[in-house]
Amino acid sequence: MPEINASNLDEKQVQLLAEMCILIDENDNKIGADTKKNCHLNENIDKGLIHRAFSVFLFNTENKLLLQQRSDAKITFPGCFTNSCCSHPLNNPGELEENDAMGVKRAAQRRLKAELGIPLEEVDLNEMNYLTRIYYKAQSDGIWGEHEIDYILFLRKNVTLNPDPNEIKSYCYVSKEELKEILKKEARGEIKLTPWFKIIADAFLFKWWDNLNHLSPFVDHEKIHRM
């Protein structure tokens, strides 16, 4: 395995590697906890380590989707464009609650504040729509990767943004047509997308986006989409 040289990594992002993520099996049953670092090392992923995660898709009242470009300081997928917010619930009582994915929603509220500066009071947990779950695995480089079951959360409202530059390099709201152009740029190798965002955009996103006012037919809390 390639050596990890922490001196090459951002200090703040290294501190976050100590956070305790939720270990799960392939059916999203909690089986333990481990550090964010251990969860994202390819050597552990290759042994089957899986953790719980979430992806927020935040739309404004014009039905435009907030995209972010991950900062160059990020340890996994730096500089990649992705959906509004992507992270992990932590192994604590508030974020472990599984009823209506309330634990994941609390984690999303926390990270929307940490990454995008959205005030907590602007993110009502009851306004988040938990649609479904996606299981995937992807390498970032020779050392780091992802292996997770990703809870898909939709939220539509206008919010106050004050992004943390250590987390986010840039951001923008896009229409469906603008996102299609971004996907074409990615296909030409002009920009990079995170693997989970590309999976979701290719397989599900536009269908969901077309039905923002009627998402209930797409809610499936039983199935885990294995991509």
From Swiss-Prot:
Q: Which residues form the active site?
A: 86, 148
Keyword set for this entry? Acetylation, Cholesterol biosynthesis, Cholesterol metabolism, Isomerase, Isoprene biosynthesis, Lipid biosynthesis, Lipid metabolism, Magnesium, Metal-binding, Peroxisome, Steroid biosynthesis, Steroid metabolism, Sterol biosynthesis, Sterol metabolism
Q: Where in the cell is it found?
A: Peroxisome
Q: Which Pfam families does the entry mention?
A: NUDIX
Checking InterPro entries in the record gives: IsopentenylPP_isomerase_typ1, NUDIX_hydrolase-like_dom_sf, NUDIX_hydrolase_dom
What residues bind substrate, as annotated?
36, 70, 74, 87
Q: Which GO terms describe its biological process?
A: cholesterol biosynthetic process; dimethylallyl diphosphate biosynthetic process; isopentenyl diphosphate biosynthetic process; response to stilbenoid
Q: Which GO terms describe its molecular function?
A: isopentenyl-diphosphate delta-isomerase activity; metal ion binding
Source domain of life is Eukaryota
Catalyzed chemical reaction(s): isopentenyl diphosphate = dimethylallyl diphosphate
CC cofactor = Mg(2+)
Q: Which residues carry this modification: N6-acetyllysine?
A: 176
| Pathway where this protein functions | Isoprenoid biosynthesis; dimethylallyl diphosphate biosynthesis; dimethylallyl diphosphate from isopentenyl diphosphate: step 1/1
Entry note: cofactor = Binds 1 Mg(2+) ion per subunit.
Question: EC number(s) per UniProt?
Answer: 5.3.3.2
In terms of one coarse class, where is the protein primarily found? other
- Binding-site positions, Mg(2+): 40, 51, 146, 148
Q: Which GO terms describe its cellular component?
A: cytoplasm; peroxisome
Q: Is the Isomerase keyword given for this protein?
A: yes
Q: Where is the Nudix hydrolase domain?
A: 49-199
Motif placement: Microbody targeting signal: 225-227
Q: What cystine pairs are annotated? A: none
Q: What does this protein do?
A: Catalyzes the 1,3-allylic rearrangement of the homoallylic substrate isopentenyl (IPP) to its highly electrophilic allylic isomer, dimethylallyl diphosphate (DMAPP).
Q: How does it assemble?
A: Monomer.
- Family recorded in the similarity comment: Belongs to the IPP isomerase type 1 family.
Name this protein carries in UniProt: Isopentenyl-diphosphate Delta-isomerase 1
Question: Which organism's genome codes for this protein?
Answer: Rattus norvegicus
